[in-house]
Amino acid sequence: MAVKKNKEDNSEERQYSTLTKDILKRVDHISIENELRESYLTYAMSVIVSRALPDVRDGLKPVHRRILYAMYDANLTHDKPYKKSAATVGEVLARYHPHGDAAVYGTMVRMAQDFSMRYLLVDGQGNFGSIDDDPPAAMRYTEARMTRFAEEMLNDIEKETVKFVPNFDDSRTEPSVLPATVPQLLVNGSMGIAIGMATNMPPHNLKEVVNAIVYYIDHQDAEIKDLMRYVQGPDFPTAGIIYGKEGIKEAYTTGKGRIKLRARLEVEETKRDREAIVVKELPYGVVKTTLHEKIADLVKQGKIEGVADIRDESSNRAGIRLIIELKKGVATQIVLNQLWKHTDLETTFGIINLALVNGEPKVLNLKELIKYFVDHRVEVITKRTEYDLNQAKAKAHILEGLLIAQANIEEVIRIIRESENTDAARTTLMNRFKLSEKQAQAILDMPLKRLTALEKLKIEQELQQLREFIAYCEDLLAHPEKILAVIKDELKKISEKYGDDRRSEIIGKTNDTEIDEEDLIHDEDVAVSITTQGFIKRVPASSYRTQGRGGVGVQGGKSQGEHYIEHLFVASTKDYLFIFTDRGKAFWMKVHEIPALSKISQGKSIKFILNLAPEEKITSYFTVSEFDPKQSIIMVTKMGTIKKMELKHLENAKKRGILALTLENNDELVAVSPVQTGDDFIMTTAAGLALRITEEKIRKMGRAAAGVKGISLDDDDICVSGNAIHKGESLIVITENGIGKRLSSKQFNVKGRGGKGQIYIKPDNKTGNVVSVKTVGDKDEIMVVTTDDMTIKIKADSIPELGRNAKGVKIVNISDGARVSDLAVVPADNEEKK
């Protein structure tokens, strides 16, 4: 049994081997790389040709074409009752477009939206969405039909003017292109993303496009600049303003370009004696509600300042009215510039004139777009004329037969009466009067009423008209220039019927209309405060009146426990502000970019402005009127290290920040001061020691350097400040208990770097710790802020200049539990400049 089984197994193996060999003979070995490439290209071309790109001739993608043809087939013309959108979508899906219903309905909705299409192709009834991005109602609720304009796309389609191809299941045919009496691609544009390419064609004004086409027909050697005399530029359904003509020229010349779009704004006076910016037209594609929310967010973040209120008063009657109400005294142009910069009130439209030409994607310039449309119309009118000619000849042929019958009516009647049947009568008539089969059949079908003399006259007149029409058609086909004349006449009628005024305004170069924000900013001194929790604000320094030494001051913020003003300084709104953190990170910004708020406001979080790490703290700052890359600064750390560096290393810091100093463990950056060549620099410690050194003795270093030793400190001492000393300036010191004094800089001798320094104050329980040391001129003023956010402004010369060992005098009266948190200098030259 075992032997028999082995023989059977061997037989099966041989059969399997033979079968495998036969299969392998029929297997083609191909490269997977080539197969992937070819399959992907096949798929890509299918997407490009069958879905994503418009045909240059009728300007439609397949889905648009199928929707219009399905409506035409269902007789949904502009003068017929509306029909449920679901019915049209169902027809399109069942007969022509085997894709999702959402894609078809979404396309049909867009064809009915007056903010999406320059010239509507679908007349919708019901909720078809809004410019606020509200979704349309479901297709079972809405109704639609073709617009009169869309019907022009299908004119003469029944006259064999375009090629029909089988649909997806070969059950019927559909047009491969529409006759398109109107230049749809130019007037409505197109958008689509294919595989590896995209089209983004803007809409245009019908009158302008028609005028350009007419000019091209008369001057086919015209250059693009000649055509641009008629087509000024895109014309968007949402209107708006197009800034600059260079992008338009580039797009019309090369097929690609970028244009800048802006909303149309008007400035109105409100009932509360404020100015309001009213948005009346939006850039194409901008959603109003999204824009509204974006502006509100930017106002909250402090990126847009001076806005009191934002509200939407848009309606069907009033149109778009987005109101941006400004605060009193705010420069409107500054707010406008901020809106242009940060919101979609200004956008860019990238033009890509990509369309299918003979089934292949091609980027087209303006002249080519016009040329291919004219070529298509020539072909359509030629085929239409040939069809009309054949129909006219066929009808004339029949009428000629009827006239022969009427001329020989007695004999015709006799032949019919004597004939055995219809076929015999037809044959006899054909032989007797030399008629064709169609003529003979027409005579047999002719009713008796046509035998009257009046009917004979009508037939003769109709035949004469047909002969004239035949002559016209033959002449038209023999003279191509006459076909072009027909195209011109039809286009002019289209323009008269549907043409309207331009909506989008085109004005000159953007640079000609932009106003430099810096030129519009009021140059004034402002007091800038930063709280312990990182809230920043600016208020006019003039809002703090000058008081006598020893006063209480006025409320300068909203202190809450440990949340109080920690830093205070005065600067011009046009100054550059450099901010440094304890970790040695540097930022810079313009002072006017700091949110302008009331004195009692706590401010805006600085994290909305600067890219600060969670535990990072601001420890020092300075301002300069000009950004001079060669300007030197000196940085001082808590452990007495100093470093000199040029501002050029911080040029890229801006609001994202950059590391300005490499710190050792447990060290912190505490002070930064700009210095000029020849200045002296003084470092002060918490224990009351000051070291004066010469700036020239400190070498400049790169951004990554850690610095060098500046002052020697006792174990329990730390460095608290560092200031450049200019001629005529003295030091001003203030402690946390409000005790302070001025010291002449002459009291401090110039020492070498690394020394211990000289006493400038002896802190004790009465004075409290040293809070701030600054340099001040006799004519300057100072501002002192306390932890309960009281601020006092006094003249510097009201504080006596005392010796190094003197304790000082009372500068500010402090309430119980409060202490001084910072001191700011208001330079006299700023007051004079203001």
Curated annotation (Swiss-Prot):
Active site per UniProt: 141
Entry keyword annotation includes Nucleotide-binding: yes
Keyword tags: ATP-binding, Cytoplasm, DNA-binding, Isomerase, Nucleotide-binding, Topoisomerase
Taxonomic lineage: Bacteria, Pseudomonadati, Spirochaetota, Spirochaetia, Brachyspirales
EC category: isomerase
UniProt EC number: 5.6.2.2
Compartment list: Cytoplasm
Family: Belongs to the type II topoisomerase GyrA/ParC subunit family.
Keyword Nucleotide-binding: yes
Motif GyrA-box location, chain numbering: 547-553
An example Gene Ontology biological process: DNA-templated DNA replication
Main location: cytoplasm
GO cellular component: chromosome; cytoplasm; DNA topoisomerase type II (double strand cut, ATP-hydrolyzing) complex
Function according to Swiss-Prot or TrEMBL: A type II topoisomerase that negatively supercoils closed circular double-stranded (ds) DNA in an ATP-dependent manner to modulate DNA topology and maintain chromosomes in an underwound state. Negative supercoiling favors strand separation, and DNA replication, transcription, recombination and repair, all of which involve strand separation. Also able to catalyze the interconversion of other topological isomers of dsDNA rings, including catenanes and knotted rings. Type II topoisomerases break and join 2 DNA strands simultaneously in an ATP-dependent manner.
The protein's assembly and partners: Heterotetramer, composed of two GyrA and two GyrB chains. In the heterotetramer, GyrA contains the active site tyrosine that forms a transient covalent intermediate with DNA, while GyrB binds cofactors and catalyzes ATP hydrolysis.
Pfam families with a match to the protein in the record: DNA_gyraseA_C, DNA_topoisoIV
Source organism of the structure: Brachyspira hyodysenteriae (strain ATCC 49526 / WA1)
Gene: gyrA
Protein name from the UniProt record: DNA gyrase subunit A
